[in-house]
Each structure stands twice: as structure tokens, then as C-alpha cells.
Amino acid sequence: MKKLIAVLSMLALFAVAGGARAQDKDKAPEKAAAEAKAEPAKAEARADAKAGEKKQAAAAPAQAAAPATPKCGDKGFDCNKGDIAWMMTSTAFVLLMTVPGLALFYAGMVRTKNALSTVMQSFSIFCVVAVLWVIYGYSVAFTAGNPFWGSFDKLFMLGEDPATAVAATFSKGQYLPDFVYCMFQLTFAAITVALIAGGYGERFKFSAMILFSILWFTFAYLPIAHMVWYWDGPDAYTTAKAGEEAAAHAGFLFQKGALDFAGGTVVHVNSGIAALVCALMLGKRNGYGKVAMAPHSVMMTAIGTGMLWMGWFGFNAGSALEATGAAGIAFFNTLFGTATAGLAWTLTEWMVKGKPSLLGICTGIVAGLVAITPAAGYVGPIGAFFTCAIAGIVCFFAVTKVKSWLGYDDSLDTFGVH
């Protein structure tokens, strides 16, 4: 019985297979007819594809001959979007240093009755310098003129097209929009003038302070900035002869080989000396040495210190002008070196006075930030460590000993720290 069922099953399978073959044979003419109808359409599609390829081949030489559209700048040099974003961020960071960072740092160190006027000084100085910088400051500091003074070619930024006006970086063929670089340098000028307030704190009338700021910005800051930082950019140094011509247009100290990565000379030495001169010319505050003049809010000073440290990353790392390894090492040194200086000041104060203080570590941190500024992009970790450690110790004695020995009243220790 099982054999019979197996035989019947095999016969059924053969029958199904035979029927399928018969259906395929019946459909074969239909498939052939359909393929015959589709063949003209396929041939037409192939012809269209070949025609398209010929058109592309004919257009290729024309595309190759067409000039490339400039990405940025009237000479077609490249402006990297990442660099632009980094520089605008750095500009905002440096703004944070002055308002409210420096304003709070200084306000906490004066007496209560002078706190608001001290904050007002920082804000008003920033506004005055910002306006003057756009009117004539940027043009004087960063255009070709003579080794000590630029020109007036960019007054009010007139004639500058935001789409094409560029400023050089430190890499050939890499540029920044001129308006971005102008704003970055504006924040440097503003904080430099504001720093001097530490030398005349609690002694200047508002009107006298404004007049002094305008005059000092014009006749002290701008020439120094031009002498140290102005040059034609790396693309001007194509040959030895071209390099000589470009060097002749550079600032006086730049020609002499001065290296100032982020403003050790232009910002800190400049403002520190000015603060000392102000302190000596104005004389001591009424009651100095007889009446207690302790800081009214060290907590406010500590908050200002934190904002200064935060903003200083834009100050130092932003001075690389590109988001490159130079910016990275400057960022590293600004953190590591500053911490070293704060610790060095604290340990020195602990040994000399018997206990550390919050005001002391805040001042040590600022001393470290100042010390690493000119070398931030030039030294490695070891260089940053020793530079800032020495600065923390030296500035401690400059503030606590040298000032009393020489007898000047530098209200907020601008000279001793900067």
C-alpha cells in the first residue's frame, strides 16, 4: 500500500511539472512579443544616455576654464569658517574680561563708597575706546604708515566690504574677515585702558578719567600696538626682496624681532607703567597709611577673578588667529601656568604671613595670567610652569614689599602685578 501511495505521489509531481512546462511554452511567444515591443524604448534610452555623456564631456572644458569663485577676500584667499567662529567666540571672551570681569575684580578691592564709581569706570572706558577704535584706532594701529604710526585709510572702516575685506593670519593663504579681526583687537585696546584704573583708583574725577583715557589710548596704546603687532602678513614674504620690502612696512619693534604672542608688551607692560606714573603723579590717597583701606568685598573680587580667567582663554588662545595647534598650546598654558602661579603665590604667602588668603590666590592667578600672556603660544608645559611659578613669587613681593619700600600708592596693584 505504501509503495502504491509513493508511486501515485511521483506521478502527481511529474504531472504538475509537465503542466508548468506547457504553460511556459504557451507564454514564450507572449514574452518574445513583449520584449520585441520594449526593445525600441531601451534603444532610445541608451541613445539619450550617450547624448547626455557627450554634453557633459563638452561642458567639462568650459567648467575647467571658468575661474574659481573666491571664498573670502578680494584675492580669493580662503577664510576658514571654523577660524571665523573661533575668533568671534574669543572676542566675546575678551569682552567678558573687562565687563564685568575687571569691573568686579577692581570694585571688590576698593572701599564701599567707591565701588560703584569703579565699576562705572570700567564700563565707560570700554564704551569710549570701542567708539574711538572704530573711528580711527584700528586704522592707526593696523595699516601701513611708518614704523611708529599707521595711516587713516580705514577711518570708520569706510571702503571696507564685509564680503571681501580680509586681515592676515599667521598661515599663508589663510585670512580672517577684517571686521572680525577689528573687533578682536578692539577688546584688547579697551581692557588695556581699563587696567590703568588700578593706579589712580579712588582719586580721579569722572571727567578727568575720560579725558585721560582718550589721550592715553591715542598717544600711548596705538603707537605701541602698531610697533609690536603690525606687519603685512605671511603672504607678503614670497622672496627675499619682497620680504625686505614687507619688513620695511612693519612696526618698529616687529622689525627688531619682538615676540609678543598675546600682549605682554602692548597690554600689560604698557598699562602697568602707566598705572605707576599715575600713582606717582597723583600722590597718595587721603589717609593712606593711617586709615584702614581694606577691600570691601573679597567675594566680589573672587567672582571677577573667575571671569577674568575664563575670558583670558579667548585673550591668549584667540591670539593664534586660527583654530590650530598654536591655539591649543596657548589654551593649555593659560590653564596650567595660571594654576601654577596661584599656587606659588599661596605657598609664598603662607610661609611669609603664616596663612594664605582668598585675595592672595586671586591676585596670584591674575599674575599668572599676565606672565603667560606674551609666551602662551611659544612655550611648552615646562616653560609655562617655571614662568608662572616665578611670576607668582615675584609679584607677591612686588605687591607686599616693594610698594611700601618705594612709597607709592598703587591702589589696586596694577604695576606690581602687570
PLM region spans:
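Hydrophobic alpha-helical transmembrane bundles of multi-pass membrane proteins
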Residues: 4-5, 23-417
